[in-house]
A protein has these predicted regions:
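N-terminal small/polar-rich segments of proteins
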Residues: 17-85, 121-162
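Intrinsically disordered, low-complexity regulatory segments enriched
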Residues: 45, 97-98, 114, 136
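Positively charged n-region of N-terminal signal peptides that target proteins for export
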Residues: 1-4
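Extended, solvent-exposed segments with strong compositional bias
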Residues: 101-124
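N-terminal signal peptide c-region/cleavage motif recognized by signal peptidases
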Residues: 7, 12-16
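Short, surface-exposed beta-strand/strand-loop-strand elements in extracellular ectodomains
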Residues: 87-101
Length: 162
C-alpha cells in the first residue's frame, strides 16, 4: 500500500492558474489640427500657404504631458495628394516654425530645431502645449500656369518617443 501511494504521488499534478495582468496607457503626446491650411495662387505658376501670398498656414498643436520624452517631427509636402493632371515638374519649398507656446521656455524650440530634407524636428523638453505652423509652396515648371482645379497636399505631423 505504501508503494501504491508513492507511485500515485508521482502522477499528482500541481494546481496551475493563468492570471491576466491588464493596463491601459493614455497618450502622453497628442497632436490636434488647430487650423487647416489653404493654398493661394499669387501668380499663375505658384501655389503658396504663406499669408504674404494670400494663403493660410496650417497649424498643429502638440499637447505633451511628460517633459523630455518626445520629439515633434513635421514634414512639409513635396507632392500633391490630389490635383489636376500635371505635365511638368514642381519645385517645392517649405518650413515649419513654432507659432505659440503655453510655457515661456518652449520658445527655445525654434532655435534648437533640426531640419533634414523636408522634415523639421523639435525636441519637446517641457510639458505643455506648442503650436507649429508649416509654410508650403509649389512652383510649376518653367513658370507655366497651373491648370485649373483643386490641389491638396498633406503635412505629416508625428510624435516620436525618445
Amino acid at each position: 500500500m505504501k508503494y501504491s501511494i508513492a507511485i500515485l504521488s508521482l502522477f499528482a499534478f500541481p494546481a496551475l492558474a493563468n492570471v491576466e495582468i491588464t493596463g491601459s496607457v493614455e497618450a502622453k503626446c497628442v497632436i490636434q489640427t488647430t487650423k487647416s491650411g489653404s493654398y493661394c495662387n499669387p501668380i499663375a505658376s505658384k501655389l503658396s500657404t504663406t499669408p504674404a501670398d494670400g494663403g493660410v498656414l496650417p497649424i498643429m498643436r502638440y499637447d505633451v504631458s511628460i517633459a523630455d520624452a518626445y520629439i515633434s517631427s513635421i514634414t512639409h509636402p513635396t507632392s500633391f495628394s490630389s490635383s489636376p493632371s500635371l505635365t511638368d515638374t514642381l519645385a517645392w519649398t517649405g518650413s515649419t516654425s513654432v507659432t505659440q507656446t503655453s510655457v515661456a521656455g518652449m520658445s527655445a524650440y525654434e532655435a534648437a530645431k533640426t531640419v533634414v530634407g523636408n522634415t523639421t524636428n523639435f525636441n519637446l523638453t517641457l510639458a505643455g502645449s506648442t503650436w507649429f505652423s508649416t509654410a508650403s509652396s509649389a512652383v510649376y515648371g518653367s513658370a507655366k500656369p497651373l491648370p485649373g482645379g483643386t490641389y491638396t497636399a498633406v503635412v505629416q505631423a508625428s510624435c516620436i518617443a525618445k
